[in-house]
Design a protein with these regions (language model features):
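Transmembrane alpha-helical interface segments in multi-pass membrane proteins
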Residues: 348-350, 355-402
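Basic-flanked hydrophobic alpha-helices used for secretion and membrane insertion
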Residues: 160, 164, 168-305
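Peri-transmembrane interface segments
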Residues: 38, 42, 248, 282-341, ...
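N-terminal Sec/SRP start-transfer signal
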Residues: 1-33, 47-48
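Short helix-loop junctions at transmembrane helix boundaries
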Residues: 42, 323, 388-434, 447, ...
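Hydrophobic, regular-secondary-structure patches
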Residues: 36-122, 129-155
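Internal alpha-helical transmembrane segments of multipass membrane proteins
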Residues: 23, 325-346, 384, 393, ...
Length: 465
């Protein structure tokens, strides 16, 4: 009779104890798989959001991430159009690319001089159509709806501001913002003096600017240091206020067309960008695309440019990913300990109850190694069946209940609720790894009791009552 068959029959001898141990392991495996599926789905959602905002890759002047915000004109890509054309036309890159578009980051002072108010801003200039395509990216097939954008190609002077910035500029009524916090009525003297200086520049911008805004439009004047160091000012029509997920960002956010941002930084008729943003069709080919982009960029500009990934441009992505993976690792460790003690206790009790039987088996010539193997297999069988049951329960609960229940939560930095999903069916390696790990842990926890059983002396075991 085979050792495996003996182990299986011994598992069935005490069905109640085996069932309790199996249920414990199943719950532990289900917890690991469901948490792992939730972490996988959350990371995919975070990657989708990050890639929509900043793309997969960015080509920029070397050192821009460290020093570019202080002087965007100095670190700008002045002649980005030929490079963008090369990247789009490259036979290896063309099938991988979804969007290639320039962006320009700029900081300065925003003013609404009708209300004698001003505040600092941080703006990003985008090509309207390219931005809409970026915000619709769903390369991970999550079914996430496209994010809205207020930028329009036929409205070159229109942009959006954060709700916090709108409050600082006293635009609550003008932009019809609900739950808007009103600014204090009194204006400090120093601020009034600064506003007077900015008002003079605003008048110059109105006189030198293009067509006047439509009647009733909400006009915000944006002031920033130009390429020559002298201040430039442009007039932007704020079409709406968009609430940002982070308060500090909400109080400085401005989104505007690329041409308007270029006019603010470089003056009329000049062009430049902070970076070329590349969004891929598939995130899985990021390393391949980065290597090829780096080669094309080096051939074009030598070592003056560098290629950065979205994780480097947005460091918070890796921080959140590490946090979730650490949480998953901690819970997995706890479930492993539960499995370890549950199986060890079951096998220990089996050894104690069957001491006489062990003596009989040894007396008829069964070697110590086979005794040890039999008890290890008992623990392994309970662990394997419990893990398989737990994975099956996780698949049923996640796919049939939780993913269709409409549960949602609002992550930090978001303003809209995100559906709670558990990606179990797309995590085959997680399911297989859980079964193998639980089985291995069960075998390891059975080894010491099995060793004790195998080391029993035949005479002592037979005399055991």
């Amino acid at each position: 009779m085979s050792t495996l068959f003996l182990a299986w029959r011994n598992v069935l001898r005490n069905r109640r104890r085996s069932a309790i141990t199996l249920a414990t392991i199943a719950v532990a495996a289900m917890a690991v798989v469901m948490l792992g599926g939730y972490v996988a789905a959350t990371i995919k959602g975070l990657e989708t959001l990050t890639v929509r905002q900043v793309g997969h890759l960015q080509v920029m002047s070397r050192g821009y991430l460290e020093f570019g915000r202080a002087n965007p004109a100095r670190h700008a890509l002045r002649d980005y159009a030929p490079l963008a054309g090369r990247l789009r036309a490259d036979p290896q890159l063309a099938p991988l690319l979804h969007v290639v578009t320039p962006t320009l980051q700029v900081q300065g002072v925003a003013g609404h001089f009708a209300s004698a108010s001003s505040s600092t801003f941080s703006a990003a200039g985008w090509v309207a159509d390219d931005r809409a395509r970026m915000l619709a990216w769903d390369g991970l097939r999550l079914g996430t709806p496209p994010l809205p954008t207020a930028l329009r190609a036929d409205r070159p002077d229109d942009g959006v501001i954060g709700v916090g910035l709108a409050q600082l500029l006293d635009l609550c009524d003008a932009l019809a913002i609900a739950d808007c916090v009103r600014a204090p009525a009194a204006v400090p003297a120093a601020a009034a003096a600064i506003d007077a200086d900015l008002a003079a520049l605003s008048r110059q911008a109105r006189e030198a600017g293009p067509a006047a805004p439509a009647a009733g439009a909400v006009v915000v004047d944006l002031l920033a240091a130009g390429a020559s160091g002298a201040p430039n000012i442009v007039r932007m029509t704020a079409t709406r206020a968009e609430r940002q997920g982070v308060r500090e960002l909400d109080m400085v956010h401005v989104g505007l067309p690329l041409a308007l941002a270029q006019r603010l930084v470089f003056g009329t008729g000049a062009a430049g960008a902070s970076a070329l943003v590349l969004q891929l069709e598939d995130s899985a080919r990021l390393d391949e695309a980065r290597a090829r982009v780096a080669a094309v960029v080096h051939d074009y500009a030598g070592d003056t440019l560098e290629v950065r990934t979205f994780a480097e441009v947005s460091p918070s992505y890796n921080q959140v990913v590490r946090m979730f993976r650490t949480l998953f690792g901690f819970v997995s460790l706890l479930m492993a300990v539960v499995t370890l003690f549950a199986v060890a206790n079951t096998v220990n009790m089996a050894v104690s109850e069957r001491t006489g039987e062990i003596g009989s088996l040894r007396a008829i010539g069964l070697p110590r190694a086979r005794i040890r193997r039999m008890f290890v297999l008992e623990g392994g069988l309970v662990g394997a069946f419990g893990a398989v049951l737990g994975v099956a329960l996780a698949v049923v609960l996640a796919g049939g209940l939780i993913n269709h229940a409409g549960f949602s939560w609002t992550p930090p930095g978001n303003i809209t609720p995100v559906p709670i999903t558990i990606d179990v069916q797309g995590s085959a390696r997680l399911c297989l790894g859980t079964v193998l790990a639980m089985t291995l842990i069960a075998c390891i926890s059975s080894w010491w009791p099995a060793r004790r059983a195998a080391r029993l002396e035949i005479v002592e075991a037979l005399r055991h009552a």
